[in-house]
Amino acid sequence: MATLVSPPNFCAKEDAEALRKSVKGWGTNEKAIISILGHRNAGQRKEIRAAYEQLYQEDLLKPLESELSGDFEKAVYRWTLDPADRDAVLANVAIKKSTDVYNVIIEISCIHSPEELLAVRRAYQLRYKHSVEEDLAAHTTGDIRKLLVALVTAYRYDGHEINAKLANSEADILHDAIKDKAFNHEEIIRILSTRSKTQLMATFNKYRDDQGISISKNLLEEGANDFQKALHTAIRCLNDPKKYFEKVLRNAIKRVGTDEDALTRVIVTRAERDLRDIKEVYYKKNSVPLEQAVAKDTSGDYKAFLLTLLGKED
């Protein structure tokens, strides 16, 4: 379930006018920006942007980008984007940084539905005049490149049919490849990038039943390389995204110096989807409410905005 609290009735024109006053007056009114945008869903934000452009012949994103700063600006800017366009931006930033590129690309590729992933790929082409797979191929090499390109171009069956015989045979294929340390085996990439999530869950369950250990734990042996870590991330995203995102948040908050990029990414992308469920997983794992952990590690308008998206006013 979502944490976003948005009103059923709103006026896009009134919101656009209020936002104009917030960014064009004497000093930016950050509280007004948070109170409006932090309580509007994707459809409502799209209407506000359209109304703003019609009224002022300017995209709302431009004054937000120029008048706000730091982590607060980044969070508000990405939140205001259309979800598919936002993911295109996240993918491009990850690719260009070339560090931990696989985490963001795998999240987008493995957690979205086939239609959502297709929308992200279209948004990426429209924004950057390249395909995401083209840019990925240019900035990665070897087995990581093979895996990421296969995942980002996948269009999986999205139904609930399970082939038990196939789950059994592919659990054996995965076990043999891992046992032989053939982590770059083409069959692993084929299975992870073509099977439906329902089918993969059946395969992973069969693997655990047969081997007495989950496939994700089996991959993260001592000295695991980047490709093994990427496989592990893909399996976690496909199998249990809520637990995956809880760990991303935990790592972002508990590291020395908060990882604001990861913290912003999870809260902004999940607030309208399943952030309430992720909060529950976080509390069970850490015995601390996520809002409390975020409030302790952030400050100012950035903190206020994240807490608003988490459903808790500062």
Curated annotation (Swiss-Prot):
One matching Pfam family is Annexin
Positions bound to Ca(2+) 3:
298
- Enumerate the Gene3D superfamilies for this protein: Annexin
The record's annotation in InterPro entries points to: Annexin, Annexin_repeat, Annexin_repeat_CS, Annexin_sf, AnnexinD_plant
This protein's GO cellular component annotations are: cytoplasm; plasma membrane
**Which sites bind Ca(2+) 1?**
25, 27, 67
Q: In which tissues is it expressed?
A: Predominantly in developing fruit.
> What Gene Ontology terms describe what this protein does at the molecular function level?
calcium ion binding; calcium-dependent phospholipid binding; phosphatidylserine binding
The biological process GO terms on file are: response to cold; response to heat; response to salt stress; response to water deprivation
The transmembrane residues are none
Q: Which UniProt keywords apply?
A: Annexin, Calcium, Calcium/phospholipid-binding, Metal-binding, Repeat
Binding-site positions, Ca(2+) 2:
253, 255, 257, 297
The Annexin repeats are at: 10-81, 82-153, 165-236, 240-311
Q: Which family does it belong to?
A: Belongs to the annexin (TC 1.A.31.1) family.
Please give the record's comment on domains: A pair of annexin repeats may form one binding site for calcium and phospholipid.
The protein's name in its UniProt record:
Annexin-like protein RJ4
- Report the source organism: Fragaria ananassa (Strawberry)
